[in-house]
Regions:
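Conserved glycine-rich Rossmann-like NAD(P)H-binding loop of the short-chain dehydrogenase/reductase
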Residues: 28-43
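Conserved mid-core segment of classical short-chain dehydrogenase/reductases
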Residues: 62-70, 74, 91-108, 151
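Catalytic Tyr-X3-Lys loop
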Residues: 84, 100-119, 138, 162
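Amphipathic alpha-helical dimer-interface segment in Rossmann-like NAD(P)H-dependent oxidoreductases
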Residues: 113-133, 171
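Conserved glycine-rich cofactor-binding loop
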Residues: 12-13
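Rossmann-fold cofactor-recognition segment
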Residues: 49-65
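Catalytic loop of short-chain dehydrogenase/reductase
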Residues: 92, 130, 134-175, 187
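C-terminal helical subdomain
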Residues: 175-178, 182-183, 190, 198-238
Length: 238
């Protein structure tokens, strides 16, 4: 990733922070996007300690508008002049609840953060990404066999819809410099997963850092092998 500029959403989260660290170690200039500045600053310090200088961009996807994403793309262009990759790690899940008992706002939030916000951000970044010789738009996705079951609500619905968005975007970009791909990691020990499984009963989950290298692969030229597909990666518990 030497010389590349990569935007990571949900950068303060489990996979987002691990992927940001790995992308930075691989030579990328990393833009850390998240809604909690204090956590982003801690991650900034970790990256700076390994000799790189990331950028922080606090933004809450829940309330961000298309204009906010356009402003982000304009700032990236003005300050860095390029954008070679976007890694969509940001996600929102409030727990397993029957639909009829779920707050309507929670349903809307699950659909928005996990689908609409990703579409809006991609839409804003694509013009700048098309100027690169090779760029990657990567969606981190959940396992449909799991989230297609009862009680997953707006989050589960958004996961299904993202596959359609990915396929549509791939069809639009297949002959250009922007590669679109998905990454479906195995179970990870994250705050999101903890809302569905207790630690005591969760024997499958692994450290999100186990999937950081897969993120780098998809962002790098080697990711062309996965163009238009969802790469299902599995890491066995240790």
């Amino acid at each position: 990733l030497a010389g590349r500029v990569v935007l990571v959403t949900g950068a303060a989260g489990g996979l987002g922070s691990a992927a940001a660290m790995a992308a930075s170690a691989a030579g990328a200039t990393v833009i850390l996007l998240g809604r909690k500045p204090a956590k982003l600053e801690k991650l900034y310090d970790r990256l700076a300690a390994q000799g790189t200088e990331p950028l922080i961009y606090p933004l809450d996807l829940i309330g961000a508008t298309p204009d906010d994403y356009a402003a982000l793309a304009e700032r990236i262009e003005s300050e860095l002049g390029r954008l070679d990759g976007v890694l969509h790690c940001a996600a929102d899940f409030h727990g397993l609840t029957p639909l009829e008992l779920t707050d309507p706002a929670v349903i809307a939030r699950g659909l928005h953060v996990n689908l609409t916000a990703r579409a809006w951000l991609s839409q804003a970044c694509l013009p700048l990404m098309r100027r690169a010789e090779d760029a990657a738009l990567v969606f981190v996705l959940d396992d449909l066999a799991r989230v297609g079951q009862a009680y997953w609500g707006g989050y589960g619905a958004a996961q299904h819809a993202q596959r359609g968005l990915l396929a549509s975007l791939h069809g639009e970009t297949a002959n250009g410099p922007v590669r679109v791909a998905g990454l479906q990691p195995g179970p990870m020990r994250t705050g999101l997963r903890a809302r569905a499984y207790t630690h005591q009963e969760d024997f499958e989950a692994v450290d999100p850092a186990r999937y950081a290298d897969a993120c780098v692969t998809l962002l790098a030229p080697a990711g062309s092998a996965y163009r238009g597909t969802v790469w299902e990666v599995s890491a066995a518990p240790r």
